[in-house]
């Protein structure tokens, strides 16, 4: 049989084409089976869907897939390869969004909801105030963000905290001096501090911001107002949270910062980070040293941090974090009261660590299981007494030099103050605050307009205090747990609401319930042009705070318990309570370029803790304590009430893409309503505490009198920031100011004759101040930059409480080097 050659080759070509098409189809089918699917939706800050948004999926520097959103904002794109990806999203009229990097493996379906900010405004999201990532435009809470760029030339966070509304920062001394935060007139231990979801404050709320380094701080979020619903006790005035950065670059990147300045100041910092397939990593180490301006007041702080993440798949991630700080400083005391420096030292060690399992199920059910722990140790030593020793009936008393103490209110006192007492030296003391706990939290998105959040948290808190000189060896342990649930949603993308509540079971004070309700609405939605965007806000909430260890261990109940006594009606020290409501308006004056915010708040602090003398406990509370209680001079009780109300204003101006300015002003009206301190009861009895040089003026020697302002809460505070940013050059001027505030010298019966001539009237005793800082950064190359940070340009000496001189003008100059990272 003979075959035509043309037919043979034609048949071969047909079979080849058939096989090729089949093979290509098989490849496509196999690729689709192995593809990473990324889906979600694109919305504006008010939750409205954005159609025709362009979405690009980047792997490294390459665009591996792209697509556009549908009219309802939904999108879905696929990539044939696995690895780490970034979503880049843009749409006409909106700012470009660069999402957080994520891992996607074969067959993974990754859900990523995207929010595009209005043009020229970087989208800001709060998590602290709501528990869920929420655009600031949808939140009714009063929240401010401090970005990592704001901290780029700072060695700490203290001066940036001054640049926030409603916040009063008080630092007793210079670098490393104890720094407290008073928010909206609240107490200094009423701020919950969170590091990667780990409670960082002491048992009972105390936290020293003066030893917190800016190293490994990926910006701070400050929620003003109580949030006991989400964070339990101690979040009675505010919540301050920050996270350790994540590694994001495909190649390892090493960042180094080195600088030096006056007062023998130097700082070195190194950061190593990156991400490879399922793993992301970040580590950091720094040390800061300064001699300060007083003798024997040298300060140093060393910080180390790590953040390691591992993605099991596109929806489940494991993460572990640790942050450790070790610091030491002098204890010079109130130099202006003695004219001589005390010979003391304080050392602090703080370690915060935690681990999480994070899972998203089918895109709308999010679950997190977290273990957290903290270890905080503080040691203080008074090496030897300073001053002149004078013998008396009760031993030696050491007096400082002759000084004139001048108050900001025009009063003054001249003399020698008692600054130390005889005994065995050195005199050490130490305390520890440890915490371990577990938390499970879950949130479910029913629709784009309604979400639910709930959590359960268990904490095991332990504390000890040892002071051999005072024969104190105390310890305490608390096991607490709480439940909370919260609904969050919107109506027609115009009215946004938050409704939640929590039940806490505290070892000391039993069960407490805390509600919360927030509402935000837009009579005029944001847009371009004049006065196009009006947001109204309202919040109501209650908060509770547990006592700190020192007040618990010195409470009447514990003192009786230690003596083996019980008295009817005397129970453990109770919860401190707060009820607050606030309302405000955010008004766009000209689009997103000029914004004005106004807020009014009213706080009622009840059942606050104060020390009450033994005779007053018997007279006013009807409690007679037998003589068998050792060293009983009084005890801590829930007997103090005070109020705080005020207004907060903020103004932001984005003149151009290079120039930005913002400012704010806060007025605070606070008032002590009820107190049983010894000074108050002495005044009630007709024998007020006075200074013989200022007769007729009642003085609160250790706490404020009824009708007066609480100590160290300035009635007027404010700030302004002017910043210029270009491709290679960045400069900023930042200023904070504060009016005079009430305080005490705490020098009752402490002059050379045992009198009160150095105890000055409380009203406006602390000085007001204006602090001006400036920084300049120049980018020489993409890998190398130089900078200068200048602080206290006006050389203000009275930015802290009376008696404690502030660090005068100081500066640091240094360089930043970046290696690797692609």
List the predicted regions and their residue ranges:
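Short, acidic, small-residue-rich periplasmic hinge/interaction motif at the N-terminus
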Residues: 56, 90-94, 105-150, 158, ...
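N-terminal periplasmic accessory domains that precede
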Residues: 112-114, 157-160, 177-182, 194, ...
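Extracytoplasmic beta-strand/coil segments of soluble accessory domains associated
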Residues: 158-199
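Short acidic/polar hinge/loop motifs at secondary-structure boundaries
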Residues: 198-225, 306
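Transmembrane beta-barrel wall of Gram-negative outer-membrane proteins
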Residues: 262-289, 294-329, 342-374, 439, ...
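Membrane-embedded beta-barrel scaffold of Gram-negative outer-membrane proteins
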Residues: 279, 364-382, 463, 522, ...
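Conserved C-terminal beta-signal and adjacent last beta-strands/turns
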Residues: 309-311, 346, 707-822
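Gram-negative outer-membrane beta-barrel transporters
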Residues: 490-497, 602-604, 623-747, 785, ...
